[in-house]
Amino acid sequence: LVIYLILLGWCLVAFVAGRLLPTGHQALRLFEGEALAVVFLGFFAVPYQHLAGLPTLLDIRVSQQHRFLAPFVVGIAFALADLLALHFIRLPATGQLLPSFLQPFPYSFLYFVADAIYLEVIYRLLPFTILLSLLGHRQLTAGRTPLAFWIVAALCAVAAPYQLIVKAPPALMVTMYVLHFVFNMIQALFYKNAGLLASLSMRLGNYLLWYILLGMWLQWHL
């Protein structure tokens, strides 16, 4: 629970920091109170992950390589795929497609890490813990993957990329949606095999390149 309290504390700092920044920055994104409440709610699900047959936050059966390094590298690989899609499918010249990249650094680092934590709570911790504890925990505990897991994983993978639906060429929207559907399915597998910190590490690897570093480049070159 101490690890989760650190994650919750990070989100609280992001919530406060965004409201202390000067308001003149265009497209400033705030970490909302609703998101903070969801992360707080996740605190009560953490002790029950084992009832769903899922690894605990620091499960001793999971190596640090599988918990942090491997998913982080996979996340970076997906960010590179996003960048390739962005490069080969031309964007409209309105400058409105990527407002989330234009967060001021270092606030962007604080905000996007908090956003990653929030998304992992709402698309991994809460739905998987609640539904699998009711439907599929015996099979997961026995080393089998129940149908309930695939259903929850697919539903979350369909819902999670909705934020990518923006004004852009249809080819780019379809490409990004498919990439992030696959991204979320792989995250679900990391969560099943290595726990919440593994799926979070994958998203952080993706966010580091796609949002934070690319956002810094856009901030300093536009």
Predicted regions and their residues:
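Alpha-helical transmembrane segments in multi-pass membrane proteins
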Residues: L1-Q49, L102
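Juxtamembrane "helix-exit" motif on the non-cytosolic side of transmembrane helices
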Residues: V16-G24, H87-P92, P161-P169
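Non-cytosolic membrane-interface motifs at loop->transmembrane helix junctions
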Residues: G24-F31, Q96-L102, P169-F181
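Juxtamembrane helix-loop-helix connectors linking adjacent transmembrane helices
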Residues: Q26-R29, L51-A116, L132-T141
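Transmembrane helix-loop-helix hairpins at the membrane interface
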Residues: F105-L222
